[in-house]
Curated annotation (Swiss-Prot):
Misc. comment: Plants silencing NAC029 produce abnormally shaped seeds.
This protein's GO CC annotations: nucleus
ATP-binding recorded as keyword: no
DNA-binding region coordinates: 106-167
Tissue spec. comment: Expressed in senescing leaves, petals and sepals.
Gene3D superfamilies given in the database record: NAC domain
Gene encoding the protein: NAC029
Segments forming domain NAC: 9-161
Expression induction or repression: Induced by the heterodimer APETALA3 (AP3)/PISTILLATA (PI). Induced by senescence. Induced by abscisic acid (ABA). Induced by ethylene.
Organism: Arabidopsis thaliana (Mouse-ear cress)
Protein name: NAC transcription factor 29
PANTHER family linked: NAC DOMAIN-CONTAINING PROTEIN 72-LIKE (PTHR31744:SF233), PROTEIN CUP-SHAPED COTYLEDON 2-RELATED (PTHR31744)
Knockout-associated phenotype: No visible phenotype, but delayed leaf senescence. No visible phenotype under normal growth conditions, but mutant leaves show a stay-green phenotype and deficiency in chlorophyll degradation during extended darkness.
């Protein structure tokens, strides 16, 4: 099948078919020699290559690649497929998943992982394959003329799983951005809070227009009357005539002192 070049695809085209669409519109048409909706899936025997060599075998795909591939028998008289590749092998993982179209079972999906080396001591890699085959493909897979061909075609979706370290770095980068944003909010909120406190403090420092005598006595910058020890500076206000009137005169002097302070404080 001739593969369409990426340059001829419509702008913004993305190939993200569902499992059902891959079976019904692509794999079924391929096995029946009918044209597919878009000719972007090449015919490649994927077992003749290692998975990292496959992206260069197609002109379409960035993070995942699709191929129509035949499957060979592992043993001449068996029905098990040969999963060996150039420098390793594909190993099935999990159970097969049935693909339905409406109420009909139209295909099967199998997940496989690529291992480097020979079984059973192969080294697991991050390369993954989803293999799609028709539901009735096993019934049609009869040996013909000594051929080792098991299936005429299966559809393979191959991709490389994102490494755990890369994913962790991306998550850490995201968390750093979140923390930086939170710290910025804290600084702004703290600045706003301090501004409000300063405004409140400045407002509270304004002297009231009217004050009671008790309030004046409690103000820090004036202090209680008991702190005023030297009354000599106010001697000109009143001079007592005798010792008998000294206490009463002292009270009079204190009242005048308070009036004097009150007038001085409210000159602003």
């Amino acid at each position: 099948m001739e593969v369409t070049s990426q340059s001829t695809l419509p702008p913004g085209f993305r190939f993200h078919p569902t499992d059902e669409e891959l079976i019904v519109y692509y794999l079924r048409n391929q096995t029946m020699s009918k044209p597919c909706p878009v000719s972007i899936i090449p015919e490649v025997d994927i077992y003749k290559f290692d998975p990292w060599q496959l992206p260069e075998k197609t002109e379409f795909g960035e993070n995942e690649w699709y191929f129509f591939s035949p499957r060979e028998r592992k043993y001449p008289n068996g029905v098990r497929p040969n999963r060996a590749a150039v420098s390793g092998y594909w190993k099935a993982t999990g159970t097969d998943k049935a693909i339905h179209s409406g109420s009909s079972n139209v295909g099967v999906k199998k997940a496989l992982v690529f291992y480097k080396g020979r079984p059973p001591k192969g080294i697991k890699t991050d390369w993954i394959m989803h293999e799609y085959r028709l539901h009735d493909s096993r019934k049609a897979s009869t040996k013909r003329n000594g051929s080792m061909r098991l299936d005429e075609w299966v559809l393979c979706r191959i991709y490389k799983k994102r490494g755990a370290s890369k994913l962790l770095n991306e998550q850490e980068g995201f968390m750093d951005e979140v923390l930086m944003e939170d710290e910025t909010k804290v600084v702004v909120n703290e600045a706003e809070r301090r501004t409000e406190e300063e405004i409140m403090m400045m407002t509270s420092m304004k002297l009231p227009r009217t004050c009671s005598l008790a309030h004046l006595l409690e103000m820090d910058y004036m202090g209680p009357v008991s702190h005023i020890d030297n009354f000599s500076q106010f001697d000109h206000l009143h001079q007592p005539d005798s010792e008998s009137s000294w206490f009463g005169d002292l009270q009079f002097n204190q009242d005048e002192i308070l009036n004097h302070h009150r007038q001085a404080m409210f000159k602003f």
